Each structure stands twice: as structure tokens, then as C-alpha cells.
């Protein structure tokens, strides 16, 4: 009898459920969105119950459509870095505080500068930053004492879901390694990190491998989801590490680059490793597979800003003609030669995570002359996003013990031929676009196949995932980028103090409004 597998990806803007055949073909996918509550510049929260209902209803839509298809297991992918404070009655004291919430910025700075933060990073693998639960919980225990005094647990969104399903507080090693509080070598909570956070191990969930299987789901919830309560649930991992699995970037030297709204670059190694300069993360996939890399804030949001602020007339024409506005932007960029005639754009419109880990950095054009036109600025912005990812790539290659063999490119940007070729030229590497568009859900299911013993290694992934586009570097273009890249990198270093000064000035404008 043919069996099927269900991958569920709990994301920041929506939850996706995808039903796959066991050879990786998509049978059906469902998605339910939910709001991100941002009442001010620093707050980014969600309602955990809305997310739980999205998990139930995406699954129910699929099982209702395919009642005859036997689901052999359900496996989970989840966004990282969320925090929910829970009281002694297992009820939330806070909304779900997401990775994008910056209210713990002051505590992240204090941990980094005064509380031995770099040594904590080297043991835990998560750069000290407001995104990390370590910073968020330290902020709650020190500045929100009315919450901390009632908090029995601090959990993430996947832990909240599994508590509803199985009445247990459990966290997989992958999500735990993204908290800033798990010792990578000991696979246990780090004493010093917990001391900084102001909590004990009892405040956190039980640590389990990403391959841990749960059964005996709550009968009431199983009915709502349309599944057998004995269906195996694989706890799974974080969306980032599973994306590498889902695009077949798992062998030594293979790198996955994703650009959606934000972006990331990652590779898999066989044992945990951190960076002496603190530029990259190290998260668990399994005990033999660890993912190192860096996330960037400024991906597609830069293109959206260019679209809205620089190209309103072109976009209006595109809309009337039924053409995708982003296709128009990339066509405009094609009119300019690589390097934008010496115009550089630092794409830091939303601060930046890797490799700078500085929320105060700001965007800028450099090299403007009278001969530069709008199309130069558009191309420079596209190039700036890739330049920035390349600086993360350089940090990553310093931590790898061999050469890069290929780059797997995914996310919205992979649909643009201009951007794909630009990446190949700047990175001076072959760029391949895999056939998978649901990489985190597929990655969760591949991990599920491994957990349930249906495959004994991840080598089977290559049979599931073909490729659609392949680009190799154009030497003349690569030469231009080789000349400009050191200028791009040096500028961001030289402006470090000025970034802080201008960010302070901008914050002052907000408080005086």
C-alpha cells in the first residue's frame, strides 16, 4: 500500500502543510497566514493560539481532501528564536515574541560587552543578538518582573504546539541550539547562559533529538486534524537547517543560499564549530550533521523599497500590461553593466545580522556621479544584496575545511535570471536552482524518513530533487566584482562609529515626534 508523509512548516507569516509521496512528489499543499503584531518599532509578536489553529486547519484541509491516503508520519519544521512565557496553569503570560522583536537590544549589548558574551556564543553557537531567546529571557527576568515572577516555563512556538498535542514540554536539539542557551558539545543547557538569563533548567523544556518520535496524540485534536491518534509525529528541526536538506545541499562543500524577504547562507558540517570573530551561527540538524551559516535582514525587502521609492512610473506601466513589477526592475538593471559603473549600495535598510551583527548599520549609495542614472541605482541595489551575502560566505568559508563545490539557490530571488547570474559572478561559483519550492517541509519529511528508518542516510535526497537552472561565472563580470568587493567591505568597517551616531540621531527623531 502506498504511504504518504506530511511536512508542517510553522513560519513567521504562515503555517504550511504539504503532503508528499514517499519519493518526494508534492500531492497537496495548504497555507494559513496570521498577523505579526508590531505596535511599535521594536515589538514583533504573534498569538500562539492562532498559530496552533493554523497547524490544525492546514492538516485538516489535506486529510479531508485525501481521506484514502495513509499518512505514515507527520514531521515539523519551525521558525527559530521565539519565546512564550508560561504560567503554572500552562497558560501563556505573553504573546509569542518572535525573532524580529528587538526589545531586548539593550540586554544583548550588555551580554556581549559585560557578561562574557563571546565565550557563551562559542559554546552555544548563537550570536549574541536581540533575536536570541537568551537576550529575550534576560530582558523579561530583569525588566518585566511582573511576568518573570509568574513564569513556570519559557518555550518556543513548536514547544507550544507539542504541549497541546502530547501534553509534554519538549524541544529538539535544533531549536534549542538556536536559543543561545544550549551547550553544543554537551547537548545540555549551558549553566552560564542560564545564569545570565536568570533562570534554571526547570524553566526550559526537555531536550530531545530531532529524530524523536511521538505517538498517542490528544484524541480531540486528532479528530480535528482528521488523523489517527497513533500517527507518528517526528519532532523535526528548525526551518533553516531543514531548508538545506530540502534543497539537497548536504554534502561537504555544498552551500545553500536563500533570499526571500530576508536571506541566509548555510552549509552542513559533521561536528559543531563556531567562529572566533562571532560572525556565524552553528545549529544542530542531527548528532552527525551541523549547520553553520549566517542570516541577513536585507534581501527582497531592498528590492521592494527600490520598487516603491524609485520606480513608481515603471511599475504603473507594468501593472497595466500585466507584467510582474520585479521583472521590469531586473530588465532595467540589465541595461547597466556589472559593477554599476562604480556605484556601490550598502543594503542595510533594516540594520543587519550576519556578518556585522549590528542593528545600527544603515544603507547608503557610494560613488554617485552626474553620469549615474536611476537604472544604475537599481542595479547597484541588486548587487549590494549579493555583495552582503558574499561577506557572510567569506566568513563561512573560513570555518569550512575544504573548498565550496556548488551553491544551491532558493527563495523568490531564484526566479530572476539576472540575480542568479549576478550571484554566480560575484561568488565565482556554479549556482544551481533546485526543483523544490517547499524546501523546509520537504526537509522535515526527509528527516522523518530518516527518523522512522525508511532511509539510512540523507543520500536518498538527490533522487528526490532535480534542478531547473544552472549558471556559471562570466569572467569579465567576475573581474569587475573582484575589484569592487574590497571597497564594499572596507566601507562598512570604516563607518562603524558613524552608523551608531546616525542611528542614535534617528532614534532621537522618533522620541521627539
From Swiss-Prot:
Listed Pfam families: FGGY_C (PF02782), FGGY_N (PF00370)
Keyword Lipid metabolism: no
Transmembrane annotation, as ranges: none
Species in which this protein is naturally found: Bacillus subtilis (strain 168)
Activity regulation, short description: Catabolite repression by gluconate.
Protein name (database record): Gluconokinase
Keywords: ATP-binding, Gluconate utilization, Kinase, Nucleotide-binding, Transferase
GO BP: D-gluconate metabolic process
Gene Ontology molecular function terms on file: ATP binding; gluconokinase activity
InterPro entries: ATPase_NBD, Carb_kinase_FGGY, Carb_kinase_FGGY_CS, FGGY_C, FGGY_Carb_Kinase, FGGY_N, Gluconate_kinase
Superkingdom, taxonomy of origin: Bacteria
Family: Belongs to the FGGY kinase family.
Cross-referenced PROSITE patterns: FGGY_KINASES_1 (PS00933), FGGY_KINASES_2 (PS00445)
Residues bound to ATP: 16, 261, 300, 412-416
Amino acid at each position: 500500500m502506498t504511504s504518504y508523509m506530511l511536512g508542517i512548516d510553522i513560519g513567521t507569516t504562515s503555517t504550511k502543510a504539504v503532503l508528499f509521496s514517499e519519493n518526494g512528489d508534492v500531492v497537496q499543499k495548504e497555507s494559513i497566514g496570521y498577523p505579526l503584531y508590531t505596535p511599535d518599532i521594536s515589538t514583533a509578536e504573534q498569538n500562539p493560539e492562532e498559530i496552533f489553529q493554523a497547524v490544525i486547519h492546514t492538516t485538516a484541509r489535506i486529510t479531508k481532501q485525501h481521506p484514502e491516503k495513509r499518512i505514515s508520519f507527520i514531521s515539523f519544521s519551525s521558525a527559530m528564536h521565539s519565546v512564550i512565557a508560561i504560567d503554572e496553569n500552562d497558560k501563556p503570560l505573553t504573546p509569542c515574541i518572535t525573532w524580529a522583536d528587538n526589545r531586548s537590544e539593550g540586554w544583548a549589548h550588555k551580554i556581549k560587552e559585560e557578561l562574557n558574551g563571546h565565550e557563551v556564543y562559542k559554546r552555544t553557537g548563537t550570536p549574541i543578538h536581540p533575536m536570541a531567546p537568551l537576550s529575550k529571557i534576560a530582558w523579561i527576568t530583569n525588566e518585566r518582573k511582573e511576568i518573570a515572577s509568574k513564569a513556570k516555563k519559557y518555550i518556543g512556538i513548536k514547544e507550544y504546539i507539542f504541549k497541546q498535542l502530547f501534553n509534554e514540554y519538549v524541544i529538539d536539539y535544533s531549536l534549542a541550539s538556536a536559543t543561545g542557551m544550549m551547550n553544543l558539545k554537551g547537548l545540555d543547557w549551558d549553566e552560564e547562559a542560564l545564569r545570565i538569563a536568570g533562570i534554571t533548567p526547570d524553566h526550559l523544556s526537555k531536550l530531545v533529538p530531532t529524530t524523536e518520535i511521538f505517538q498517542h496524540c490528544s484524541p480531540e485534536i486528532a479528530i480535528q486534524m482528521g488523523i489517527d491518534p497513533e500517527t507518528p509525529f517526528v519532532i523535526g528541526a528548525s526551518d533553516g537547517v531543514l531548508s538545506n536538506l530540502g534543497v539537497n545541499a548536504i554534502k561537504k562543500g555544498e552551500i545553500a543560499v536563500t533570499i526571500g524577504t530576508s536571506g541566509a547562507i548555510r552549509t552542513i558540517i559533521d561536528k559543531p564549530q563556531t567562529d572566533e570573530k562571532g560572525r556565524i551561527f552553528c545549529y544542530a540538524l542531527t548528532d552527525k550533521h551541523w549547520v553553520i551559516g549566517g542570516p541577513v535582514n536585507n534581501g527582497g525587502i531592498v528590492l521592494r523599497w527600490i520598487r516603491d521609492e524609485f520606480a513608481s512610473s515603471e511599475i504603473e506601466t507594468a501593472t497595466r500590461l500585466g507584467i510582474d513589477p520585479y521583472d521590469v526592475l531586473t530588465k532595467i538593471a540589465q541595461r547597466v553593466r556589472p559593477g554599476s559603473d562604480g556605484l556601490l549600495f550598502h543594503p542595510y535598510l533594516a540594520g543587519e545580522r550576519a556578518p556585522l551583527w549590528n542593528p545600527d548599520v544603515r544603507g547608503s549609495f557610494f560613488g554617485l556621479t552626474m553620469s549615474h542614472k536611476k537604472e544604475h541605482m537599481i542595479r547597484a541595489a541588486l548587487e549590494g544584496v549579493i555583495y552582503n551575502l558574499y561577506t557572510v560566505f567569506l566568513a563561512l568559508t573560513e570555518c569550512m575545511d575544504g573548498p565550496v563545490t556548488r551553491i544551491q539557490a532558493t527563495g523568490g530571488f531564484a526566479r530572476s535570471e539576472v540575480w542568479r547570474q549576478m550571484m554566480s559572478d560575484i561568488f565565482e561559483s556554479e549556482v544551481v536552482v533546485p526543483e523544490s519550492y517547499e524546501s523546509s517541509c520537504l526537509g522535515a519529511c526527509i528527516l522523518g524518513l530518516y527518523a522512522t528508518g525508511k532511509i539510512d542516510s540523507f543520500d536518498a535526497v538527490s533522487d528526490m530533487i532535480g534542478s531547473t537552472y544552472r549558471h556559471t561565472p562570466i569572467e569579465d563580470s567576475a573581474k569587475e566584482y573582484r575589484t569592487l568587493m574590497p571597497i564594499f567591505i572596507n566601507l562598512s568597517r570604516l563607518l562603524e562609529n558613524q552608523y551608531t551616531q546616525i542611528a542614535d540621531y534617528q532614534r532621537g527623531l522618533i522620541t521627539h515626534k
